[in-house]
């Protein structure tokens, strides 16, 4: 695992559908890299973010018995808590690896919000809303139109991420065009 410049692993505690970090130094390091959301005196990470950070070797997650969970153990837990976890994790990992800043898109009915590489997220808005689908999914054209309209109404573009059975991802950039 690559530790990059994080040094010692940061400890988080599994709490339902999120992982909580209380260590001030850990909060500072992770929030500076745009992971999680600072909520008072702690940082809240999504399960997808926590899995990604465990995979990087930056985070260890503890549960009830205070024993660190492996990536596989957290993954199995998270699959029972979050729909389409595997697909979302693959897309999150791919986008983060490409240098994008990825945040939750829940408030917009999307899986993620995507910021440009190097964006100052305190001063700039996200550019894309990302919706993740398995390759074999289907939806009505009216549903797709609805996704695009929501993105347009909040001045964002829609990125549809299609994940195939091998874990390969194809992205489709959708924009609203007024006839």
From Swiss-Prot:
This is tRNA-splicing endonuclease. InterPro entries: tRNA_endonuc-like_dom_sf, tRNA_intron_Endo_cat-like_sf, tRNA_intron_Endonuc_cat-like, tRNA_intron_Endonuc_N, tRNA_intron_Endonuc_N_sf, tRNA_splic, tRNA_splic_arch_short. GO terms for cellular component: cytoplasm. The keyword Nucleotidyltransferase does not apply. Homotetramer; although the tetramer contains four active sites, only two participate in the cleavage. Therefore, it should be considered as a dimer of dimers. The keyword Lyase applies. Keywords: Lyase, tRNA processing. It comes from Methanocaldococcus jannaschii (strain ATCC 43067 / DSM 2661 / JAL-1 / JCM 10045 / NBRC 100440) (Methanococcus jannaschii). GO terms for molecular function: endonuclease activity; lyase activity; nucleic acid binding; tRNA-intron endonuclease activity. HAMAP family: EndA_short.
